[in-house]
């Protein structure tokens, strides 16, 4: 009996220790989470400047844009994602899948975090996502001063990651970009790329970036965002033909009329030579990334008589920057046009409208009093061809989101994707029509 009581007491003691240890661990985790969210005194502007000029801190606060290009030497046939941590800020990438025996995967994703004065390192973790649990495979620690500032924020550099679990030894290809600390970290792709271009131009000139979007007019913001859609692209028509490379640029060809113009080269564009062609932005009704090929996206646009389907292949930047940026710019341009249309017209505009109404009444055979005059018996319609410009679809209903994905598994990926887009578009249009009797 005494032995049984002794065993029961020992078991109770071990259970109490286990419960106590678990409670302590939980309490410490909660304490770390709470203290992690508390701001540091140097986040105050005056204290931060004082600490920096006294030499206590070796850098001031800034935002860093981490561009993840590729992963290499990763496990086969798995799902991976990355997390970036810097002080109180963190960001998580989307899940990328490693297919078959391939141990190299293209990521092409951007994550932005805020670096405080007190932060000395940025940590990047690589996770393997499974059905039951998630495993942390490796990590990379970048020193803010030594690896970023002193090396002038290196671009497309390979880093070997420290292995935590598994047999593979991953490495990661990164580009680091320094941005203004006043910018929000949750930016849209269009704003993010526009700010990055502006920052790079300021760095090349050796000037400080002074940019305030809130003080810009709607027209100035459109011009600022339009630079995102400038660069080389390979163009392939949906009906076949050779793939040709052009240099594209968003241009305001007339007041409030924007077109996506293209030249044979960047030099031809900058020298002011005649453009090869153009696509009105408001005539674009569909922007669709290719699901199977991260380098390709599909665009459908319209002119007066026909619709045109074109595939584009990226050259020097991620495909999503083109497709998402194109979609966002069209939405902003459409909103700007709608805002302009609600304004009170000037006297010159009112006179123009009155002249158009009078001309229309004369064509319809109305007299000045508003009553229709009898049409002459021998009258003929004018054979003069129509001179109306290309169709400007400002109210076109978007059929697909730019982030929508159309599967294509056959070797002729472009052709199958085009056929499925045609089928889905026709079904959407037919579904809106009333049944004919």
Swiss-Prot record:
One of its GO terms (biological process) is symbiont-mediated perturbation of host vesicle-mediated transport. Its main location: membrane. Residues 375-384 have a biased composition (Basic residues). Residues 45-179 form the C2 domain. It is found in: Cytoplasmic vesicle, Secretory vesicle, Rhoptry membrane. Residues 341-437 are annotated as: Disordered. It holds the Pfam family PH_CERLI1. The keyword Membrane applies. GO terms for cellular component: cytoplasmic vesicle; rhoptry membrane. Residues 230-338 form the PH domain. Keywords: Cytoplasmic vesicle, Membrane. Disruption phenotype: Intracellular replication, parasite egress and motility occur normally; however, host cell invasion is severely reduced. Complete inhibition of rhoptry secretion without affecting microneme secretion or rhoptry morphology. Disulfide bonds: none annotated. It is a peripheral membrane protein. The C2 domain is a non-calcium binding domain. Cooperates with the PH domain in the binding to phosphatidic acid (PA) and phosphatidylinositol 4,5-bisphosphate (PIP2). Essential for tachyzoite invasion of host cells by controlling rhoptry secretion. Binds to phosphatidic acid (PA) and phosphatidylinositol 4,5-bisphosphate (PIP2) lipids and thus, likely contributes to the assembly of the machinery that docks or primes the rhoptry to the parasite cell membrane prior to the fusion with the host cell membrane. Interacts with RASP1. Interacts with RASP3. This is Rhoptry apical surface protein 2. The lineage of its organism: Eukaryota, Sar, Alveolata, Apicomplexa, Conoidasida.
């Amino acid at each position: 009996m005494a032995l049984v009581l002794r065993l029961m007491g020992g078991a109770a003691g071990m259970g109490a220790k286990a419960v106590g240890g678990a409670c302590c661990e939980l309490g410490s985790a909660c304490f770390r989470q709470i203290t992690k969210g508390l701001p540091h005194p140097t986040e105050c502007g005056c204290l931060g400047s004082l600490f920096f000029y006294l030499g206590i801190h070796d850098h001031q606060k800034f935002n860093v844009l981490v561009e993840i290009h590729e992963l290499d030497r990763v496990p086969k046939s798995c799902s991976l994602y990355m997390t970036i941590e810097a002080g109180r800020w963190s960001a998580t990438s989307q899940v990328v899948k490693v297919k078959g025996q391939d141990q190299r995967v293209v990521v092409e994703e951007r994550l932005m975090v805020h670096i405080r004065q007190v932060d000395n390192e940025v940590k990047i973790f690589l996770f393997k996502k499974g059905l039951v649990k998630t495993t942390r495979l490796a990590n990379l620690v970048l020193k803010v001063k030594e690896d970023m500032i002193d090396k002038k924020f290196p671009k497309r550099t390979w880093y070997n990651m420290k292995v935590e679990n598994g047999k593979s030894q991953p490495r990661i290809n990164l580009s680091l970009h320094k941005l203004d600390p006043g910018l929000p970290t949750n930016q849209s792709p269009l704003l993010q790329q526009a700010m990055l271009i502006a920052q790079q131009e300021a760095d090349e000139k050796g000037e400080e970036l002074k940019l305030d979007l809130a003080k810009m007019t709607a027209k100035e913001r459109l011009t600022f965002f339009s630079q995102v859609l400038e660069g080389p692209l390979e163009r392939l028509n949906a009906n076949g033909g050779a793939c040709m490379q052009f240099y594209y640029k968003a241009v305001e060809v007339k007041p409030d009329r924007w077109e996506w113009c293209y030249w044979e080269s960047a030099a031809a564009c900058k020298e002011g030579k005649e453009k090869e062609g153009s696509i009105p932005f408001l005539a674009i009704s569909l922007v669709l990334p290719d699901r199977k090929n991260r380098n390709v996206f599909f665009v459908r646009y319209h002119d007066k008589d026909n619709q045109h389907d074109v595939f584009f292949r990226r050259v020097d930047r991620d495909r999503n920057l083109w497709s998402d940026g194109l979609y966002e710019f069209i939405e902003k341009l459409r909103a700007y046009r709608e805002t302009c249309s609600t304004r009170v017209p000037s006297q010159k505009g009112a006179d123009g409208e009155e002249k158009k109404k009078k001309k229309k009444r004369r064509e319809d055979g109305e007299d000045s009093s508003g009553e229709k005059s009898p049409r002459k018996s021998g009258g003929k319609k004018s054979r003069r061809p129509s001179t109306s410009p290309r169709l400007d679809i400002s109210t076109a209903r978007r059929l697909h989101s730019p982030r929508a994905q159309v599967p294509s598994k056959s070797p002729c990926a472009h052709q199958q994707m085009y056929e499925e887009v045609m089928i889905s578009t026709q079904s959407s249009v037919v579904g809106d029509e009333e049944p004919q009797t």
